[in-house]
């Protein structure tokens, strides 16, 4: 239509992980290509930050959990200080049972959000301090991710699309298997294996 812009957006933001390795690569690659082609700013937001902001306010500790397969979850801890959401512990990968035991020993109320609660829920049945969040909080919402990106946008701290990479937290199974296969051949191993998305 004459006079109308085909792509009327001026800013892009996307979750940068952790999560599915393939999903992160596809999503990140798409966002980077769009930002580069349209010459607009691109902001990356940790998936955990968006999940935590699904809960508008609570005095409880928020534990975001994303399924990491093989009985593990990606987890991060948050708490509100007034209206400000603060990261209490940066994302890490841990066995679900170990995470529950650790939080139970703190004797404080914790609410879990994210798709990883399917691994947590059976471990916290009838626990009055470890609470499974409402199902509506299990998936990151665009509005919650935008709230997390807002300070970056206000400060103009966008990323160079060519330099932005996903937050994997741990190496992929393919990298682990490659290292195991070539452990006797140092020339085949990289000191810091990475995946570049362009």
Each model region followed by its residue ranges:
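Single conserved hydrophobic/aromatic residue that forms the stacking wall/gate
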Residues: 1-11
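DPxDG-like acidic metal-binding loop motif
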Residues: 13-42
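Buried hydrophobic packing segments
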Residues: 30-34, 51-52, 145, 149
